[in-house]
């Protein structure tokens, strides 16, 4: 009975929040990658390589992830790789910082329902977006400048472009919804078995549940002082989100080995910045300043190291 109740709750969440929020971004992402559009961002390749170690072609995926939410960024990166806009190494690297949450989740669920202040939710979204960029800056190394795959595609027929994009997006959303229902059912069983009651306090329960399924953990938090915990969970994303992203990128043969470490780093960066913003203390401010400085210096250090390697080769 607990499993059925949890599954029903997951289905309601999919119908009310997940599908309406993600479907437009999934469809637009597929349509854009199918069209032979010009790529004006190629001029920014040198800047993007210095900052993030990938081509500037990942910018649409980064924006899609920050606007559409989990796992729209992973879907966009996968489509860019399929279209030949990113190499395999670049796509796997981009997945580590392009799969993020969107402003709707922060404003609606965190701001209005959890913190009771939409403005604080939007501030947390800004910190979440900043932490995603810092994560991309702090990733070690860079994707090798390999030649892009030549993808042979027929000229798209405009009359079939939208139906095909909707069909592919619905198939992807079916996988995403199935995982949400499964994790919701599993959490309901764990609660019914009394396993979550073994945790020492409500914060520990929220973090444990959120590590598995994001919204379940977020809803256990409330009031002032919950900002850092919300930021940590949103940066991490939860195993349910990660399995959703995996179901998308594995269909293209991608294997981003540093993905989980990057999402953990994203969560920690978000939590430190939230502490510095909402509960300022010397330690939190010092940590936030040090992390930001490291992120800003990372491109310079990467460029210096690349130059040293070239000189050594000569």
What are these regions (language model features)?
Residues 21, 25, 29, 65, ...:
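Alpha-helical transmembrane segments in multi-pass membrane proteins
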Residues 142-167, 303-314:
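Intrinsically disordered, low-complexity non-transmembrane regions of multi-pass membrane transporters
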Residues 1-6, 33-38, 108-109, 115-118, ...:
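Transmembrane helix-loop junctions in multi-pass membrane proteins
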Residues 1-74, 159-221, 310-314:
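Membrane-embedded alpha-helical segments and adjacent helix-loop junctions characteristic
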Residues 95-99, 103-155, 184, 244, ...:
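Alpha-helical transmembrane segments of multi-pass small-molecule/ion transporters
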Residues 123, 127, 163, 167, ...:
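Alpha-helical transmembrane segments of integral membrane proteins
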Residues 51-115, 208-222, 228-252, 256-265:
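Alpha-helical membrane segments and immediately flanking helix-loop junctions
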């Amino acid at each position: 009975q607990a499993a059925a109740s949890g599954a029903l709750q997951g289905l309601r969440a999919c119908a009310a929040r997940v599908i309406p929020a993600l479907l437009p971004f999934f469809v637009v992402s597929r349509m854009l990658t199918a069209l032979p559009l010009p790529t004006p961002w190629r001029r920014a390749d040198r800047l993007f390589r210095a900052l993030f170690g990938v081509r500037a072609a990942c910018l649409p995926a980064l924006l899609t992830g920050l606007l559409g939410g989990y796992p729209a960024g992973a879907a966009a990166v996968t489509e860019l790789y399929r279209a030949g806009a990113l190499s395999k190494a670049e796509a796997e690297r981009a997945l580590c910082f392009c799969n993020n949450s969107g402003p709707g989740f922060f404003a609606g669920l965190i701001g209005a329902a959890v913190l009771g202040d939409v403005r604080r939710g939007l501030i947390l979204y800004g910190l979440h977006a900043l932490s995603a960029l810092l994560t991309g800056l702090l990733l070690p190394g860079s994707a090798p400048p390999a030649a892009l795959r030549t993808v042979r595609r027929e000229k798209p027929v405009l009359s079939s472009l939208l139906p095909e994009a909707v069909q592919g997006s619905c198939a992807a959303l079916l996988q995403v919804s199935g995982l949400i229902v499964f994790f919701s059912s599993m959490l309901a069983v764990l609660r019914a078995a009394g396993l979550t009651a073994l945790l020492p306090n409500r914060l520990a329960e929220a973090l444990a549940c959120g590590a598995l399924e994001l919204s379940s953990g977020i809803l256990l938090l409330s009031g002032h002082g919950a900002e850092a915990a919300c930021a940590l969970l949103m940066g991490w994303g939860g195993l349910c989100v990660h399995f959703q992203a995996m179901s998308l990128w594995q269909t293209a043969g991608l294997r981003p080995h540093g993905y989980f470490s990057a999402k953990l780093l994203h969560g920690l960066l978000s939590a430190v910045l939230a502490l510095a913003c909402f509960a300022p203390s010397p330690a939190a401010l010092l940590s936030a300043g040090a992390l930001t400085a490291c992120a800003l210096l990372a491109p310079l250090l990467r460029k210096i190291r690349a130059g040293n390697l070239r000189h050594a080769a000569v």
